[in-house]
Amino acid sequence: MENTVQNKPIIELRSITKSYGSNTIIKDFNLTINNGEFLTILGPSGCGKTTVLRLLAGLEELDSGNIILDGEDITNVPAEKRHVNTVFQSYALFPHMTIFENVAFGLRMQKVPEAEIKPRVLEALRMVQLEEMADRKPTQLSGGQQQRIAIARAVVNKPKVLLLDESLSALDYKLRKQMQYELKVLQRQLGITFIFVTHDQEEAITMSDRIVLLRKGKIAQDGSPREIYEEPANLFVARFIGEINVFDATVIERKSENVVLANVEGRVCDIYTDIPVKKDQQLQVLLRPEDIVIKELDEHEHSKAIIGHIIDRTYKGMTLESTVEFEQNGKRGLVSEFFNEDDPHMDHSIGQRVGITWHEGWEVVLNDEDNQ
């Protein structure tokens, strides 16, 4: 069954607070998660993302607040009685049991009739394409196969929500990319809510319907992967999600409701923003490396671009990255271009004088956080 994200809430976290001793991890935290959603809780170490997951699973007790699952208050419901299952980073498979017995374990703990266990286990193994591995032991499987068994063991219980705690971090790069795709497909097939916890922004952007980015126990931004990447709400979000250039800008004048004339690192140009501004106000102009264009200049040419010299070039297969040091102040900008060996305009050299520009309207403009 193809999954379509519904707007009906499946989980509501209402003003939850959790402390360890005198250290408050999250305080008055609110979050609504919709039915059938693939939601990723993303953030650096210590931001509170794993604490939120453990509270959802019932592995930690709240100090205050409420957790609502499908309309029912489960704040005081023990972990084993919640319709929630967790796939841990370690997978936590029993090495002495066969794959079949590992997947069947939860059903036996719930005293499900034996006649019902076999078809449900085989169906779960079929979903993760490991039905033929039923009689093997976990040590006979690869890391990716163990990951899928851990997921099968969780979904066989027919949970309303599946929690995944950094469960791809132990895999190598190629297998991790494969499992990202497989998890997304499986979630759509099952039609249940996945809540994935990670510090890896690429995983979050690749897999999620929605990302909640945490910082010090608070939500820094909540939105779709595209919104988070292209429209960061603040400098922390912009820097956490991929590479970003942060240029200093000084307001010259407002030209219209959405256009401001500004001096950006020596380049006088239009920037697009509806932020209230006044003359000489400091702003920050954010641009992804792939949104910047290099223009070749001779040593005496003046341009409406930011002028600088190329100080480093890095070939990355599909792209070519150039670091440009600005003549005006010695700051540096990063430019990423799709590599085309037949394009003479890409043949820049170390030390070459260049100008950098961008497509007007592609920039993100924020108030200068250093001067607030």
UniProtKB/Swiss-Prot annotation:
The keyword DNA-binding does not apply. It is found in: Cell inner membrane. Its main location: membrane. It is a peripheral membrane protein. It catalyses: ATP + H2O + polyamine-[polyamine-binding protein]Side 1 = ADP + phosphate + polyamineSide 2 + [polyamine-binding protein]Side 1. It comes from the Bacteria. Residues 11-241 form the ABC transporter domain. SUPFAM superfamilies: MOP-like, P-loop containing nucleoside triphosphate hydrolases. One of its GO terms (molecular function) is ATP binding. It holds the Pfam family ABC_tran. Belongs to the ABC transporter superfamily. Spermidine/putrescine importer (TC 3.A.1.11.1) family. The complex is composed of two ATP-binding proteins (PotA), two transmembrane proteins (PotB and PotC) and a solute-binding protein (PotD). This is Spermidine/putrescine import ATP-binding protein PotA. It comes from Aggregatibacter actinomycetemcomitans. The lineage of its organism: Bacteria, Pseudomonadati, Pseudomonadota, Gammaproteobacteria, Pasteurellales.
